[in-house]
UniProtKB/Swiss-Prot annotation:
GO terms for molecular function: GMP reductase activity; oxidoreductase activity, acting on the CH-CH group of donors. NCBIfam families: GMP_reduct_2, PRK05458.1. The active site is at C175 (thioimidate intermediate). Pfam families: IMPDH (PF00478). One of its GO terms (cellular component) is cytosol. The lineage of its organism: Bacteria, Bacillati, Bacillota, Bacilli, Bacillales. This is GMP reductase. NADP(+) binds at residues 204-227. It comes from Bacillus cereus (strain ATCC 10987 / NRS 248).
Length: 327
């Protein structure tokens, strides 16, 4: 791999503005059969999303993916969302009972609009088999498969029938895969996204390493259709995590999906817990993201998201540590 870089190493170069106000810029994106207000999706993690937030997002035309850490609630969740005329977007793993779950959905004529196969190392036969299983029993569901970090993986999962792939191995703020295993896209997530996107024929979801709203625009520039974000969505009033007070400031807990806090045991731990400053309402953050992205589009010299895909950029080497103090 040559020319390796991450979000903080890149600056996009402005093109002549053609709008009078950024409010003329359209941030919508289509994924599958549906159109969404922003190319952004909160991470399918237990401290980021719950039923209430999923409902709010769906009602307001934002994409969401429900986590898979309360598997027994998924059927009622799908029913509930679809009965309200909202999209049902769920996560599955690859263990044996997940195969039965997919068959149960088919038997009950429940077809979630989106199913995300959510595995730390998605370039595996286990994921390929699950893609094929879902496509056989629920052919109408849009399948997102991940996570991966190489062009080979993207091609294999697409060939198996995935409708989109999710790219990112361990770049997340509460992910310590890069430290624990020596593997991953932490520190070069943006270059990995670019590498994978060049091989892709279907949409890519960039997952992890986003630290600023500008990173969303950079992800779009390097080939993402949708951007999954954890830490920036953690710590809101609505967030599921616990609120605590420290030195007169409010904080919320945020932990990784493979952390001991998630698993309830210290086994194969590749995630950590942190406390993030309380951020106020989720709605305010989503509005700010939209406005910042509208500004990005105006700097790109266009009126739509796609205009960002063709801008020039420079590499300004800063730090390989992705803005995180690892130790």
């Amino acid at each position: 791999m040559e020319n390796v870089f991450d979000y903080e190493d890149i600056q996009l170069i402005p093109a002549k503005c053609i709008v009078n106000s950024r409010s003329e810029c359209d941030t919508t994106v289509t994924l599958g059969k549906h159109k969404f207000k922003l190319p952004v999706v909160p991470a399918n993690m237990q401290t980021i999303i719950d039923e209430r937030i999923a409902t709010y997002l769906a009602e307001n035309n934002y994409f969401y993916i429900m986590h898979r850490f309360q598997p027994e609630k998924r059927i009622s969740f799908i029913r509930d969302m679809q009965s309200r005329g909202l999209i049902a977007s769920i996560s599955v793993g690859v263990k044996a009972d997940e195969y039965e779950f997919v068959q149960q959905l088919a038997a009950e004529h429940l077809t979630p609009e989106y199913i995300t196969i959510d595995i730390a190392h998605g370039h595996s036969n286990a994921v390929i088999n699950m893609i094929q299983h879902i496509k056989k029993h629920l052919p109408e569901s849009f399948v997102i498969a991940g996570n991966v970090g190489t062009p080979e993986a993207v091609r294999e999962l697409e060939n198996a029938g995935a409708d989109a792939t999710k790219v990112g191995i361990g770049p997340g703020k509460v992910c310590i895969t890069k430290i624990k295993t020596g593997f991953g896209t932490g520190g070069w997530q943006l270059a990995a996204l670019r590498w994978c996107a060049k091989a892709a024929s279907k949409p890519i979801i960039a997952d992890g390493g986003i630290r600023t709203h500008g990173d969303v625009a950079k992800s779009i520039r390097f080939g993402a259709t949708m951007v999954m974000i954890g830490s920036l969505f953690a710590g809101h009033e609505e967030s599921p995590g616990e609120t605590i007070e420290k030195d007169g400031k409010l904080y919320k807990e945020y932990f990784g999906s493979a952390s001991e806090f998630q698993k309830g045991e210290k086994k194969n731990v590749e995630g950590k817990k942190m406390f993030v400053e309380h951020k106020g309402s989720l709605e305010d953050t989503l509005i700010e993201m939209e406005q910042d992205l509208q500004s990005s589009i105006s700097y790109a010299g266009g009126t739509k998201l796609d205009s960002i895909r063709t801008v020039d950029y420079v590499v300004v080497k800063n730090s390989i540590f992705n803005g995180d103090k690892v130790y």
